Amino acid sequence: MIMKNLHINMAFIFVLLLITASCSDKDDSAPRVIPTMNLTVSEIADNTALITSEQQTGTTFGAKVIEFYPVADIGFDYNIEVKLVKFVEENGEPVSLPYTRKITEGLRPGVNYISAIIAYNAEGRAVCSAFQTWKASGTEGA
């Protein structure tokens, strides 16, 4: 009799453990949204440019931007995302999204530049990036 009750109790505890393990407060079936963003450089004229960036999907918690940097001065392949992210982390300025800034100083006409931005998740890890290369337009000394 005692053995039978012990087996029934053990079976009951086992079932409870299975139910508890399969139920959690996290909804694992919910689709995970990968953060994405864009960056656009426009209105390139007269030694100025307009840089804009916004979050397209997902959620981020801060960003860093390099507004413009001469492509000729970059010593790595900026098409490799890991290298570009590291470069922006080390040299970028903290910003918030959406981001808009009109560059009115420092551009040299005819120079190819890169603009890049990265965004961070809640843990402070870079989760998305965007960049654009472009050529400054204007007149020397303006």
Regions found by a protein language model. Name each.
Residues M1-A21:
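Sec-dependent bacterial lipoprotein signal peptides
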Residues L17-N47, T133-G141:
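Bacterial Sec-dependent N-terminal signal peptides
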Residues N38, L50-T52, I114-A116:
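Beta-strand secondary-structure signal
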Residues N47-T60:
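Conserved aromatic anchor
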Residues G62-I66, S129:
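Beta-strand acidic-aromatic groove motif in beta-rich domains, primarily in extracellular
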Residues V65-R108:
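Recognizes extended acidic, P/S/T-rich segments that occur
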Residues T104-V127:
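Beta-strand-rich modules
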Residues A119-N121, S129-G138:
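Repeat-associated, polar segments at repeat-unit boundaries in modular proteins
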